[in-house]
């Protein structure tokens, strides 16, 4: 796993590797390591600090940064050592289910006050019932995760239908969501407000985990990632509706992980050994010291003399 992660790193595909990490954590581990989102959120912050330390214009250079190699080596090792749980099944919503008059049998909430806790006047009234049922099912008194997931899919599906009909729904602005201002009106934040509010009603620790899940969900957020990252929401639902073992440590087998990290450069040497490079590789050398810069200029001059080629600046 560390080898293939290193391949992504060498290619500069950091967005892809973070998507894989979030997907695996939320779909295959979730309650097997319930505090894992806190760890990943901290590591994501560390990654951003390294990136903003001078690599924004050339992320490929980060592959030679030992901190980056160590960071992802540790993350992948922690994921591999975490206990795996059942995967979440996709819940399919029938077309008729979007007709409120035909799904009254699914409405179990004993009051309409639950949605009112987070509903804003700008939020679509069509989603009030869905949000109310969602909130009802994540309550401590109910803990019905499967039905809560159904209503999550119902809300996402309702948006999809509106798009097909060239209708656009947006909610009230939720400025507490850590995304660009133009995305703060997305209705998905209504779901997250329900999760955060209920988690806060339970315990500070649970609220911290939920906040970390939100931080991961919001990474470079655009509306298109909602479906791809929905298992982070499933994870959040399960935190509120399934038995939670707070004694599970985030990192197990620390010695094994330390051993892997200590040998992480071996993987990169193997990748370097197998690298297929053109003869002009020196043009793309990341370590441009004065000495090899002069050599590069000399070689370019020789190329120009032989071919009449004038390189663009």
Enumerate the language-model features and the residues they cover.
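C-terminal alpha-helical interaction modules of replication/initiation AAA+ assemblies
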Residues: 3-313
């Amino acid at each position: 796993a560390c080898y293939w992660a290193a391949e992504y790193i060498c290619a500069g595909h950091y967005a892809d590797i973070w998507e894989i990490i979030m997907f695996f954590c939320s779909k295959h581990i979730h309650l097997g390591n319930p505090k894992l989102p806190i760890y990943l959120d901290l590591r994501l912050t560390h990654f951003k600090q390294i990136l903003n330390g001078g690599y924004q214009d050339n992320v490929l250079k980060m592959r030679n940064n030992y901190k980056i190699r160590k960071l992802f080596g540790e993350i992948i090792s922690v994921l591999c050592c975490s206990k795996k749980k059942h995967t979440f099944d996709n819940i399919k919503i029938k077309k008729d289910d979007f007709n409120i008059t035909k799904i009254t049998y699914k409405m179990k909430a004993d009051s309409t006050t639950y949605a009112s806790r987070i509903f804003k006047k700008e939020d679509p009234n069509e989603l009030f019932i869905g949000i109310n049922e969602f909130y009802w099912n994540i309550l401590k008194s109910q803990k019905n995760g499967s039905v809560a997931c159904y209503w999550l899919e119902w809300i996402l599906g309702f948006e999809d239908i509106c798009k097909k009909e060239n209708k656009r729904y947006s909610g009230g602005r939720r400025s507490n969501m850590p995304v660009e201002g133009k995305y703060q009106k997305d209705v998905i934040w209504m779901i997250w407000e329900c999760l955060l509010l209920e988690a806060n009603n339970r315990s500070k620790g649970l609220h911290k985990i939920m906040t970390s899940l939100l931080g991961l969900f919001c990474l470079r957020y655009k509306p298109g990632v909602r479906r791809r990252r929905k298992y982070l929401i499933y994870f959040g639902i399960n935190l509120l509706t399934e038995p939670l073992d707070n004694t599970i440590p985030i990192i197990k087998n620390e010695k094994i992980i330390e051993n892997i990290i200590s040998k992480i450069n071996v993987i990169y040497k193997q990748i370097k050994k197998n690298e297929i490079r053109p003869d002009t590789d020196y043009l793309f050398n990341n370590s441009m010291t004065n000495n090899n810069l002069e050599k590069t200029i000399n070689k370019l001059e020789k190329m120009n003399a032989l071919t009449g080629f004038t390189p663009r600046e």
